[in-house]
Design a protein with these regions (language model features):
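Alpha/beta-hydrolase-fold catalytic nucleophile elbow
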Residues: 140-142, 190
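Conserved S-adenosyl-L-methionine
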Residues: 182-193
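Short, glycine-/aromatic-enriched active-site segment of Class I SAM-dependent methyltransferases
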Residues: 142-166, 175
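Residues lining the SAM
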Residues: 111-114, 140
Length: 255
């Protein structure tokens, strides 16, 4: 077995995500079972670093990005600067309400946002409002298992505004979605690599990045090697189910 190169380690998050079901280029799916078609109007609410937006633009979708954080919005726009299919718009907003018309979107992507908002019921209602009848929804929040594991070691600010205001249990997450009027079509979990990464990061203490790399780099090398073994896919699925970083719902608006 060969050692991971620095480039291998740089690409490990993307590799792990792809093996979880994200960024399925050949199938035109942002996540397994969530197709993005040319011409679709996609809303990326809480666009973060722009990875989801970039994929959707590459699929030929029309994309509107939104985030409460001007830094995140800027990151997304820099990432897709010069793209032959640029975003239709970029909105700095707390999404309460979303400054968009009713029923405009074919697909709504909202990853790792709901745990941050003060009123998740009102927030999800806004996501439903802006979707067309039949619109597709990809929603993720942190999994309760890793959130509970982090409680004793995370920085206090991790569970304070503007960070994680709540831990959503699996049944509560699904209920939030269905009571907003959406139909749940699939559920999944993923991200064990990041669960363990964050536990190591908290162990490093506040002196980032000096004390961080000696802990997380060996972990990244171990995970890269594990994925390359014959049992790697089974091992990944086992741990993604056991200690996932995130839980995911694919849903549809009736109509």
């Amino acid at each position: 077995m060969t050692d991971a190169s620095e480039r291998d380690l740089d690409l490990l998050p993307l590799r792990d995500a792809a093996e979880s079901g994200w960024f399925r280029v050949d199938q035109g799916e942002l996540f397994r079972g969530f197709p993005i078609a040319p011409g679709d109007l996609v809303l990326d609410i809480g666009c973060g670093d722009g990875g989801n937006t970039n994929f959707c633009l590459n699929c030929g979708a029309r994309v509107i990005v939104a985030d409460i954080d001007p830094g995140a919005l800027g990151s997304t726009l820099r990432r897709v600067a010069g793209h032959e299919n640029p975003p239709l718009g970029a909105i700095l907003t707390d999404s309460n309400p979303l400054p968009l018309r009713d029923g405009i979107a074919d697909a709504i992507v909202c990853t790792e946002v709901i745990e941050h908002v003060a009123d998740p019921v009102a927030f999800v209602a806004e996501l439903v409002r802006v979707g067309k009848p039949g619109a597709r929804y990809l929603l993720t929040v942190p999994d309760p298992v890793i959130e509970e594991l982090q409680k004793p070691c995370a920085a206090p600010s991790y569970f304070e505004h503007p960070n994680h205001l709540r831990i959503l249990q699996k049944d509560a997450f699904e209920r939030l979605v269905t009571e907003a009027g959406l139909i749940v079509e699939a559920r999944d979990t993923y991200g064990f690599y990041w669960s363990f990464w964050w536990l190591m990061a908290w162990a490093a203490g506040p002196n980032w990045p000096e004390d961080l790399q000696p802990l997380v780099q060996p972990w990244s090398r171990t995970w890269w090697a594990a994925l390359g073994t014959p049992q790697g896919p089974k091992l990944k699925r086992l741990f993604d189910d056991l200690i996932p970083k995130s839980q995911l719902i694919l849903a549809r608006k009736p109509g």
